[in-house]
């Protein structure tokens, strides 16, 4: 007969060890389950909190409380920064509150999150334009055009190239912009300015005229056209446009009066030309350049005594002006007082020997 095995716990030395192992496994399993539950709770809490602040922000937005809505969207973003819905509301709120730098960054993030829509690219293009981020304007204009070929981007591309003094590209894209929006007066104006900045005044003029035709109230454009005509020695049209600019409200400051005075003198209207320059002298009585200009205007119109009077004023402020003394001498000779005139010219030549050549030239030219 077999002997019965004794398996009583008290008699088995392995039993306590097995019991300990089982207890450890049970504790670890419970801890692991608790950790997983905690993670799920935290995750769910973050999502719930983000949605709570998002919904609260939407209510504030609907009630017209834009700043309060922004505060809630910012809180929502802290809980869930990868939410497209929250990022979109955040971008819109920043934009509405004119926080354009933050709006631009939010729209960039929205694109990074996968929302590469035409609307978002358009916002990025226009915000980059407002913030003078020229390279980004070109980048997002290209992306926008690829996503939606019907979008009008050429004005922005042309303007950026114009601002960067890249006139060739500016003219190319601005001509395309003119096709997209023929009524935008800024387009021909920038083309005109591009040609003018390259000293190609002949090509600039028709674009200035087109811009003014589209927006006749722009008195500064009219004034600029007058100056372009002046540079081309088109004195009649220079006077016409400078006068028109003044009639349409361009400020009659000293620069304007000087250019208007010169324009009058260039068409032979001594009285009006001098009147403009004298108006400047009321404000700037010791302006030597204007005094000399008036003196020369009188001299070349045969008004020799008036010329002498103004060159005398130059000498009052600058006794070393040999040229003014020389011209006074020439004026006296023209008046018939040759001896007095020659003596003054000789004295001027002593002060500045280079004037001797001028004397010879003027005598030969009968001036």
Which residues does each predicted region cover?
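N-terminal leader/linker segments that initiate helical-solenoid repeat arrays
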Residues: 15, 30-101, 105, 112, ...
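Terminal, low-structured helical/coil segments at or just beyond the last alpha-helical repeat
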Residues: 35-44, 266, 326-367
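TPR alpha-solenoid repeat register
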Residues: 52, 86, 120, 153-154, ...
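Canonical tetratricopeptide repeat
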Residues: 55, 89-92, 122-126, 156, ...
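Register position in tetratricopeptide repeats
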Residues: 62-63, 96-97, 130-131, 163-164, ...
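Structural marker of alpha-solenoid helical repeat scaffolds
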Residues: 79, 112-114, 146-147, 180, ...
